A protein has these predicted regions:
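Flexible hinge/capping segments at coil-to-helix
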Residues: 156-194, 201
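A short LG(V/I)-centered, amphipathic sequence patch enriched
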Residues: 40-57
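Hydrophobic hinge/microswitch elements
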Residues: 127-132, 140, 147, 203-252, ...
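Residues within the DNA-recognition helix of helix-turn-helix
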Residues: 28-31, 35-38, 108
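Secondary-structure junction motif
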Residues: 182-209, 273-277, 290-298
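Central regulatory/effector-binding core of bacterial HTH transcription factors
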Residues: 89-152, 315
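Alpha-helical linker/hinge and terminal dimerization helices associated
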Residues: 42-43, 64-86
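Short helix-boundary/capping micro-motifs
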Residues: 11-28
Length: 315
């Protein structure tokens, strides 16, 4: 029985699938399956099985989950302690929802790194809503920026609001929409495919069927397609302010628009939180951070966005 095997089991149990666990760890699905299989053989128990409603824990798996979670946390703390003893730089690992990752994370981390007193290794990546609390609780991320996820899975994390925003529907400046909203062509970014995100909730309330949605690899690409007259898109209002002023996009009135949203910082509870995570949380309350969130193009132009990949060490 190894730390790798226990880590794989905890993530499969928490996230509900081998696919989600592999994505969170940045490894292949066969690697997770092999680790889980080895643990099953060692313990003589199936631990978790696939049912009609997702993964189901066996009685043995249910008892193992709490203990395995503690061991995974202790392993992460041991790794951090050795790094500190070796004089290695502090690590900061941030995951974020797709829209935050596309526009906000890079300029925030760039500004925070410049302010940080000592050397800092900062990395960032994308996570869907159901992964965020699990990644933080299992020490695979220090901070997650996106929806409020603290109450979802009973994990020792807190979600604190950092920025309120408005969701609007936009189309090309000369576009004309006809008929009910659920019959329009919707051009959306990755957030719309996440049922736990504010954008996912917004689209679901309008009952937009899957066949009426075209999903683009970035929000910028979806807005560009809408500006070209291909359909309508959902946007965080302050992020498209320039396109609205230039007339490239225009607001479309739909029921429930504008919608209200909020980005939260999800972290471990205060007594368990790392010093660098606490420092980032304080920075997120500063006027400098608020300005970067309101006008992120001052940091990294959206046209240069490349979807980041979150990678963890599999050992």
């Amino acid at each position: 029985m190894t730390l790798t095997q226990l880590n794989a089991f905890v993530l499969v149990a928490r996230l509900g699938s081998v696919t989600a666990a592999a994505s969170a760890l940045g490894v292949s699905e066969p690697a997770v399956s092999q680790a889980l299989s080895a643990l099953r053989v060692h313990l003589g128990d199936q631990l978790v099985s696939r049912g009609p409603n997702g993964m189901t824990l066996t009685p043995g798996g249910s008892r193992l989950l709490a203990t395995a979670s503690q061991i995974v946390v202790l392993g992460a703390e041991a790794h951090a302690a050795v790094r500190a003893a070796q004089g290695a730089p502090d690590q900061l690992r941030v995951v974020a929802s797709p829209t935050v990752a596309e526009f906000v994370t890079a300029p925030l981390l760039e500004a925070f790194t410049k302010r940080y007193a000592t050397g800092l290794e900062a990395s960032s990546g994308v996570a869907v809503t159901k992964e965020m609390a699990v990644l933080v609780a299992n020490r695979l991320a220090d901070v997650a920026i996106g929806p409020d996820v603290a109450a979802d899975q009973g994990l020792p994390v807190v979600s604190e609001p950092i920025f309120k925003y408005r969701l609007v529907v936009v189309a090309g400046g000369q576009s004309h929409t006809r008929g009910p909203a659920h019959q329009w062509r919707w051009l959306v970014g990755p957030s719309a495919t996440d049922p736990g995100s504010d954008v996912g909730h917004f689209v679901a309330r309008l009952r937009v069927p899957e066949e009426r949605m075209s999903v683009f690899p970035s929000q910028t690409a979806a807005w560009a397609a809408a500006a070209d007259g291909g359909g309508v898109s959902v946007a965080v209002e302050h992020l498209v302010a320039q396109q609205l002023r230039r007339g490239e996009l225009s607001l479309v009135d739909v029921p429930g628009s504008p919608g209200q949203g909020c980005w939260y910082a999800t972290m471990l509870e205060r007594q368990q939180r790392s010093a660098v995570a606490s420092s980032l949380r304080r920075f997120l309350s500063t006027p400098e951070a608020m300005q970067l969130i309101r006008s992120p193009s001052a940091g990294v132009p959206p046209s240069k966005f490349r979807l980041p990949v979150y990678v963890t060490i599999w050992s």
